Amino acid sequence: MKESGGDDRPRCTFSFLVIAIRIALLTLVLCGTACAQDHYDVVIHGGRILDPETSLDAVRDVGIRGGQIVAISERPLAGSRVIDATGLIVAPGFIDLHQHDQTAAAYRLKAMDGVTTALELEIGSPDVRKFLDQRRNAALINYGTSASQPWARAAVLGQPVVEGAIVPPSGPATNGPANPEQVQRIEQRLREELNAGGLGVGIGIQYTPGASRLEIIEMFRVAAERGRPVFVHVRGDRLESVEEVIAAAAVTGAPLHIVHINSSCLRDAPECLRLVAGARARGLDVTTEAYPYIAGMTQINSARFNPGWKEKDGIDYSDLMIPSTGERLTKERFEQMRASQQPQSIIIVDNTQAMVDQVIANPLTMIASDGLPGHPRNAGTFGRVFAQYVRERQSLTLMDAVRKMSYMPALRLERSTPEARKKGRLQVGADADLVILDLAAFHDQSTFEKPFEPSIGVRFLLVNGSPVIDGGAIVPGVTPGRAIVGSPAP
């Protein structure tokens, strides 16, 4: 018997077609969303990425969007700009906690040396708000400063700011005592500077020898009130000076960072580092730094050269050198320069290579340049560490060097600002401050004869996701640097 009804095949075919179209449309919508999510502003392709916090060391692609790292992938990623990093090192940009020279020219040198953030923390700025305003929307790399104890003290004791000076000149405002009312006024100025964005309190005890131990403790208390670190240039008596500031940190609770322990302690540096290690083992928040040169630099009219400097440091006039000419000083030339009203920097040859090598290799030390114009460390500190300590001496592993230059400084800053938690790491969610370098080629070129020669070997540098070095050259006209400021008052 023949069944009733027509042929259902056209209807089935039509239904299948409708379903297929719907699936295709849904797939297109979902794929479009996914494709939009997976397309990045910048992709770094095929580089060997290093994250010093997690110890990740692997070849990956890195996706960047909106100034942040948003993807790290074993598979290739797509982006508006793809940087081929095959055979190159990709690491968090270096953070220099100790950079006095905060000019546009210095920022270019720092960038060529792999630095994405350069901060003036040892001495700080006499006017934090002015410092930040001058650089807003005009900086190649990130910047910031501390509140300045030397300049606050000088202002209260009657010494105006000297244009071009890093520290106040030696005089009554640096060498004389402050009475209780003056100490209170210094404290108040520092609180105001912290409120303006200071990352901590910069304390130059050797540059203000008139400040008693009790006065210094009160400056530590100002930082401790806000949970900010103190960044300290110690008094100059080596072991006793380090003991003084560790004790001040212990009684006030202020986080303590001791600057350039290599030059502050010289031949006593190993014992000074043991003091730091002992303090840390007992729960104190104490950190330190070093730079890879046997010579330091400071202003000749500062209290650093008050009477007795030769005996204290075991050096003579001939160990002092004029940066621009290489001239070694005599007593007469020293006194002539010392009497000048203009701030003049002088190089001090006062350390040994063996001692510097020991300090740089110590796990406690971060790398920081103490950058000043005329000294090669202003241009070449980080490249020098890679060349001499990673490649040549092999006293640092590649990861150790990156950790000392990026992650450890970021950890130090976390007590100052939450922004630091996104610095010094190569992780999803971190700021895209990244250095891409040729490990075999990265080295310093600056010397005492040619201190302004930039390092070579950094192929690309990104600051907040924007390339500032592209193919080994500075990108003209870009200013992606941002202020790193202290947390608001509670």
What is each model feature region?
Residues 138-143, 219-228:
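Alpha-helix-loop-beta-strand connector modules within alpha/beta enzyme cores
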Residues 75-91:
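Active-site metal-binding motif and surrounding structural segment of the metallo-beta-lactamase
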Residues 155-213, 246-250, 255-398:
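Active-site neighborhoods of metal-dependent hydrolases
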Residues 93-99, 120, 143-145, 201-203, ...:
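Hydrophobic faces of well-ordered beta-strands that scaffold small-molecule active sites
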Residues 25-26, 34-60, 64-65, 73-74, ...:
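Active-site microenvironment of metallo-dependent hydrolases
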Residues 85-90, 99, 104-202, 284, ...:
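Divalent-metal coordination cores built from histidine and acidic residues
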Residues 18-32:
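Bacterial N-terminal signal peptides
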